[in-house]
Amino acid sequence: MGGINMEDNKKTIFSGIQPSGNLTIGNYFGALKNWVKLQDEYNCFYCIVDLHAITVRQVPQELRKRTLEVLAVYIASGLDPEKNTLFIQSHVPAHTEAAWLLNCFTYLGELNRMTQFKDKSQNAGESISAGLLNYPVLMAADILLYNADLVPVGNDQKQHLELTRDIATRFNNLYSPTFKVPEPYIGKTGARIMDLQEPKKKMSKSAENKNGYILIMDPPNIIQNKINRAVTDNEGIVRYSDEQPGVKNLMNILSTATGKNVESIEKEYAGLGYSKFKKDVAEAIIAEVEPLQKEVKRYLEDKSYLEKVYKEGAQKASYVANKTLSKMKRKIGFVLDK
């Protein structure tokens, strides 16, 4: 199978991002920059999880557009298609098949206890989809199909990864060792970029207040305006403290964008107030995203290249996923078709 370069001595990593909206600097600083650092050390599978995106209604043409945009952002961020398996989730049917199988080894009570489901279903009433309830099982399938050793996750996904571990252990105990039980990988920096207006919440593209997030593709003037409006406090002191969540968040952003540690940032802005600090945070973000934006636009203009990447990625992913799926079916007791 040409192009499948799974090095046995390397551990495997799986992660993905939903194409359910434009990506934020939270995605970039919190996930993508860390992923790039991992690509030489691990066998990496990075997915665009479009099956997860449809747990809430999507406009079809927008979903198609954003799926390619996420792929372009992956590559523009520095994820090399030669070093990583970059693919679209729906192009590998093993994900949905494995999700059904794992559903049969997951308890309803476990899914009802998922905090994210409870939060999202509160306002949805009867319109909540079964897909949203089963979302963590599909996530388990995503991870277990590739025998991932490590999964880069934010705090909001830790509970889902715990469920993945429980499902894998349950299946292994019921039959025989089949899956690796994955561990979380949490990056040392940028693991959690918060909302600019509600700094106790994670930055999210689904936030109601557009001033709460900065998109990777936002122009410089918008970035400057959003940082200027970012919530701080009346202290006027640049200090890394849980009692100043807005300032702490801006310091995290500046630290991740520039590589400076928070101690040196505190010293640099001692006695200067927030005006210069905010200006420099905005400039640091712009310096990071402007070259990225040019690369994203360049890749989006070359649809044939993106098609080549996602087709080769799906082929490589399918090769690995189908082997795991066949093993699952055999252990469960299905008659295999080949």
Curated annotation (Swiss-Prot):
Annotated binding of L-tryptophan, by residue: 142
Domain of life: Bacteria
Catalysed reaction, written as an equation: tRNA(Trp) + L-tryptophan + ATP = L-tryptophyl-tRNA(Trp) + AMP + diphosphate + H(+)
GO cellular component terms, A-Z: cytosol
Subunit-level organization: Homodimer.
Residues in the signal sequence: none
UniProt family annotation: Belongs to the class-I aminoacyl-tRNA synthetase family.
Keyword field: Aminoacyl-tRNA synthetase, ATP-binding, Cytoplasm, Ligase, Nucleotide-binding, Protein biosynthesis
UniProt: ATP binding residues: 18-20, 26-27, 154-156, 193, 202-206
UniProt motif ('HIGH' region) ranges: 19-27
Gene3D superfamilies: HUPs, Tyrosyl-Transfer RNA Synthetase
E.C. designation(s): 6.1.1.2
Top EC class of this enzyme: ligase
Predominant subcellular localization, coarse grouping: cytoplasm
Motif ('KMSKS' region) on chain: 202-206
GO molecular function: ATP binding; tryptophan-tRNA ligase activity
InterPro entries: aa-tRNA-synth_I_CS, aa-tRNA-synth_Ic, Rossmann-like_a/b/a_fold, Trp-tRNA-ligase, Trp-tRNA-ligase_bac-type, Trp-tRNA_synthetase
Function of the molecule: Catalyzes the attachment of tryptophan to tRNA(Trp).
GO biological process per UniProt: tryptophanyl-tRNA aminoacylation
Name of the protein described by the UniProt record: Tryptophan--tRNA ligase
Subcellular location(s) per record: Cytoplasm
UniProt cross-references to Pfam families, sorted A to Z: tRNA-synt_1b
